[in-house]
Structures are given as structure tokens and as C-alpha cells.
Amino acid sequence: MRGMVSFAVWALFAALLSQQLFASVASVRFEDAKTYYLSPPSGSHGTPPSHTPPSSNCGSPPYDPSPSTPSHPSPPSHTPTPSTPSHTPTPHTPSHTPTPHTPPCNCGSPPSHPSTPSHPSTPSHPTPSHPPSGGYYSSPPPRTPVVVTPPSPIVDPGTPIIGGSPPTPIIDPGTPGTPFIPAPFPPITGTCDYWRNHPTLIWGLLGWWGTVGGAFGTVSIPSSIPGFDPHMNLLQALSNTRSDPIGALYREGTASWLNSMVNHKFPFTTPQVRDHFVAGLSSNKAATKQAHTFKLANEGRLKPRV
């Protein structure tokens, strides 16, 4: 019986001792939790330690050793309530910033996180405006295409050639025309009056007025025919006003000579007219007869030559 009492006392003592030890341990853990999880007092903003992501993460997100700060940590529900101390311990800020150690290369696996309280409330994480620039490689922005405008072609019109001799114009002589005749020739014959009134026909036929000596040859005895000069022109011979047989022979003989040149059907040829004219100068009787014959031919009353 005495042994039973002794065992109960020891058991009670052990229970009290273990409860005291557990309360001390819980108080220490609570102070530690307050040191790491309590929000900093208002007005004081400490600069968080800068963490340079190591190059050995192999593309994994950067490792942040500092735990997230919960908004209101609550003690575990299954932990017995410790005795409330008489005063609230003031958490002290560690004088030095813990240096995080570089975890080994995870090669794509997510980094390990420190243990958190068994049932903390989910802290709120603000969404960063800029993603971390650690091991992540964002896609580069699309490049703006460069449009190259092709150069405008330069057309050289060339230098005009100025100078030089102008080309020689080609003159087509064409078919030579008929000699100009101011008035129509008579159809068959023309009287002495007709030729006297159309002096341009004589000029168009001979190119000049002509002479009696050139038409009928040199007169053998010019002095025997008073008033007539062998150098007189044909228009003067047609216009003489003598009323004797020699004057009539000059008028009609000159008209016959012109008709024989323009009309191939005239009864006498040009040589025949010349011969008959010279023969008529032999005497007044011969001159009268030949002048009458030339007059009939000039008026078209003789048979035309075939």
C-alpha cells in the first residue's frame, strides 16, 4: 500500500514537471513564432534582404528562405493552453539578417519551403506587378518588321544632240510638165490676124520673138525689097501694113510658117512654107499668087495633110 502511494506521488510529480516543461517549451516556441510571424509595427518599414537567385537553379523559381508572414497566426488547437505570463514578452528584432544558404540544383523541381505551423491561416500574397527576373525567361516582344522602300528608278532621258548639218532634202523632179502655152493653139490653122492678136503664143513657141531671116533664111537681095529688114521679128512681119503683094506675102507667109510648127495636119510642112516664101519674092506676080495660096491654107480652105 505504501508502495502504491509512493508511485502515485512520483507520477503526480512527473506529471506536474512535464506540464511545466511543456509550458516553457510552448512559450519559447510562441516567442519564436512572434519573432518571425508578427507584422512589423506601423511606421517602421525595414528593407527586406536582397536575395540574388543563384545560377544553379536550372530554370526553377528563385528560392526565398524567409517564410511568408501570416496575417493572424493562431496557436494549434490541440496544444494545451499555457499559463498566461504576467507580462507580454516584447519580440526583439534580430540584429543580423540571416544569410540564406543556396539549395542544391533542383533541375526544374520546386524549391523546398520551411515548415510552417500545423494549422496557420492562409496568408494573402499580393500579386507582383512585374514577374521575378530570376530563372524564368519571358518571351521577347515581337520584332517590328522593317519595310524597306525600293528606290525609285532614275530614268536618264539622254542628252539631245544639237548641231550638225541638217539632212539634205530629197527633191523629186517628177515628170516634166508640158511647156506653158498662154492660149490654146488653133485647132487646124490660124490667120495672120489671130497670130498678131496672140503674141504670147509666138513667145511660148519659140522662146523669143524670132526673126524673118531666122524663119525663112537669109534674103538674097534685101535691098530689092524696100522697107523690110531681114532682122525684123515675126510680130513685126505679121503687123506690116503694106498693101502690095510683098507685104501680103510677109503677112500670110509668116502665119503659115507658125501653123506648120503647131499643126501636123497643116497642108504644108515647115520646109515647104520656107521654100514657097522664098520663091514668091522673085516677082510681084509670084508674090501675089503665093500670098493667095498661103491665105487659103491659113483659113483652112485647103485639103489638110494626112
Curated annotation (Swiss-Prot):
Q: Where is the signal peptide?
A: 1-23
Residues of the region (Disordered) are 40-156
Q: In which tissues is it expressed?
A: Confined to the shoot apical meristem (SAM) at the layer L1 in vegetative, infloresence and floral meristems, as well as in protoderm of organ primordia, including during embryogenesis. Also present in the tip of emerging lateral root primordia.
List the biased-composition ranges (Pro residues). Answer: 62-83, 139-154
Alphabetical GO CC annotations of the entry are: extracellular region
Record key words, sorted: Signal
Q: Where is the composition biased (Low complexity)?
A: 40-56, 84-99
Q: Which InterPro entries does UniProt cross-reference here?
A: Protodermal_1 (IPR039923)
Annotated PANTHER family: PROTODERMAL FACTOR 1 (PTHR33210:SF18)
Give the protein's function: May be involved in the regulation of meristem growth.
Q: What is this protein called in UniProt?
A: Protodermal factor 1
According to its UniProt entry, this protein's organism is Arabidopsis thaliana
State the encoding gene.
PDF1
